[in-house]
Amino acid sequence: MRILVTAIGSMSASRVISSLQMTGHYVVGIDIYPKEYHEEGYLCNSFVQVPFFNDPNYCATLIDICRRYKCKAIIPLTDPEIDVINANRAIFEEKKIALYMQSSEILDIARNKLKIHEFFKADNEVNTINTYLLSDFHTYYVKRPWILKKLHGRSSEGVVIDPTINQLLTISNMDDYVIQPYLDGHIFTVDYIRDKKSGFDYSVAREELIRTSNGAGVTVKTIYDKTLADMASFIGNKLDINGSINIEFIKHDDKYYLMDINPRFSGGIDFSYKCSGYDFVLNHCRCFCSDELEPVRKYESKILIKSYEIKSGN
């Protein structure tokens, strides 16, 4: 099959491209930057430079690329692209282009930090962090320190730890921010996959030992923790996930708290593949093609590091 993959400069792209090509798929990669700016541009079977996701012609451009290259499906790799494609599902469906991503109902929750808290706060199986719209903050008492986040934020954008009252008062669009009690602790992230038809699910967890300022783990320790696996499974089943997502937790006072749900491949999806041998990308596609998923694979705890290689772009 010919598949269009967006944002091939993102951290998950090389794993996605490799997994698709290993199983015979033809990959058309797109990005806002020229092919020469990313090694992944050369890994793709074909590459097309496209406008920013917020360009009025973005979706029309994707549809035109699918027409020219005979792509039958799209795999978006970043949240903003998922948001704009989700808002324009009808035009992709009209052209019979499959979207290998979560449903609108799931995205409505997963891309909203307040709704995540509201959706799971009554469940004993998941520990959530109390979350309030900044515009409603005066009606609640939250013990300091606080953490300020964008309501629909990604990659730690807009995060302010323990903001002052004056800082809060300078924010004009308060409905676009949430505030939470700040929890100190270690970050754990879970790559999770679920087949909606059969109910089969599987996950690989890792502790992020070194994490960039935008929330990407570059040195991690893979672990198996039944508590994390059970929480991820509960979240996936309650949301009725189909395909692969990433779930972030923070361990505070010996408890795991749900931080975020990323409705896409994590930037560290290659860590899970290298550790377990389980191909989340291939099996994600199978969830949308009525194919049987790979069975569960046991994996060992190990420390993995992200490495980089300098190459010429010419």
Region spans (language model):
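Short, charged, surface-exposed secondary-structure boundary motifs
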Residues: 37-40, 58-60, 102, 107-113, ...
